[in-house]
Amino acid sequence: MKKSIIAAAFALLFGAQGASAIGIFDNLCYQARLGYNIGGTMPMGMPASIRGLNSYTPKPSFTIALDAYKPLTEKWGMMAGFHFQTKAMETDARVKSYSMEMRQGSESLSGLFTGNVVTNAKQLVVTLPLQATFSVSDAVRLKFGPYFSYALNNEFTGYAYDGYLREGDPTGTRIELGNTPDSWGTYDFSDQMRHLQLGVNLGADWQFHHRWGVYADLAWGVTGVHRSSFHTIEQTLYPIFGTVGVIYRLK
């Protein structure tokens, strides 16, 4: 193990020296970012089993980031960074014949639920974006590219209430769920969420001062938040979040 770590350290060292020799680290501009995220995990299109949204509540979600920008030509460049992010939301939806697994008291239930479902989703992720940039002017820069995220912590919990569950299939035993905590059907699918996530990011930076600027980004996941082997929720849910925040130029 120790030999592997030493070998990796030497590889990084010589790799960095080689990159420096060809000028990759020349003329770099470093930026710190603080942003607020708003969005959620959602399907592409509204499935027939989801009849409407009673409420959507964004939860406090933030980005703390360090980016490095490298100009390649007068207009074009590239940007990479290290982003530490929280992404959270709560929804309350009306559903009909919605595939679910839940617990009511000590009993495990599965089948098709008609009623209301509350979902709380939260992730703590480290994101590595790699973007091409285009400078519209000295102050405004557009950017687009892929990102890679690793979830340090996943939460996907909630409860079904004020409805009924048909066990197994649409003709199964009908089980009533009320609107008080002891009559809800609760669920926790946190252990079925992916750790590695991929997506695309686009946005714009406006540097209105030598040091200070503002930015807006949109991150769209192309992998679902749950593992491919998870089929309790019929539709694939994707993380889609927008971010607005401030930039401070370090160099």
Describe every region a protein language model picked out:
Residues A65-Y69, Q131-T133, D205-Q207, Y215, ...:
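Transmembrane beta-barrel domains of outer membrane proteins
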Residues M1-N27, K251:
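Cleavable N-terminal export/targeting peptides
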Residues K75-M78, A139-L142, H210-A216:
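Repeated loop/turn-to-beta-strand initiation elements of outer-membrane beta-barrel proteins
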Residues G40-K59, K87-Q123, A151-Q197, N201, ...:
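Extracellular/periplasm-exposed beta-strand and loop segments of Gram-negative cell-envelope proteins
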Residues A32-I38, A80-T86, F144-Y150, A216-W220, ...:
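Transmembrane beta-barrel strands of outer-membrane/channel proteins
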Residues W206-H210, Y238-K251:
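Outer-membrane beta-barrel "beta-signal"
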Residues A21-P71, V140, S149, M193, ...:
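Short glycine/proline- and aromatic-enriched beta-strand/turn motifs that initiate or cap beta-hairpins
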Residues Q31, S61-A65, V125-P129, N201, ...:
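Membrane-embedded beta-strand positions in outer-membrane beta-barrel channels/transporters
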